Amino acid sequence: MRRTTALAMTAPALGLVAALTLAPPASAGSATTHASLRPVNDHNASGQAFVDVKGNRITVTMAAHGLVPNQPHAAHIHFGAEARHECPVMADDTDGNHHISTTEGVPAYGPVVVSLTTFGPTDPGSALAIDRFDTAPRGKLQYERGGIKVSHAVARAIESGEAVVVVHGVDYNHTAAYDAGGPSDLDPSLPAEATDPAICGVLDVVDGHGGH
């Protein structure tokens, strides 16, 4: 199991780190995990995500900046037993268009296991529920949702450093809108900019906040 130290983190929202630092050590069957969200597709955005696991329930807190403003940003937790458990790199660009699509990233991070919607279902079936994701006012995303039910396998993957947080939505042509990149590989009625990954990070257990 990989671990990360709370003191080594930087976050766009200092409150996230403060809350984590003041939290008591995790008890058996629970863990606090953290991911530094870094750019994919040369997108100028970054962020932090924390996922608290208690049994088969999770609480997700996420902050990011530099996203396409006032546009929906689908966000998910990904996991696949056969995946590399990491964020994609340009070598995953199999069609040679110099962009990494969501599908091209699957060998790295696996399929969607949790949809980080603002309300309603959070299952993989909501992966493209564009009307239920954060819209990043002024390019900033602030997200918190608790009580999300996951399977034992997904909870274990999060605690074991095998789950990946991905936020989608990029702006290749700098128009502040989703209108380029061709059709999405997930839904041809959407432009690729709407669904290509923007930022990504692997969830690792924070020192002193993990247990089984």
Per-region residue spans from a language model:
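N-terminal leader/targeting pre-sequences
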Residues: R2-L7, P12-A19, P24-H212
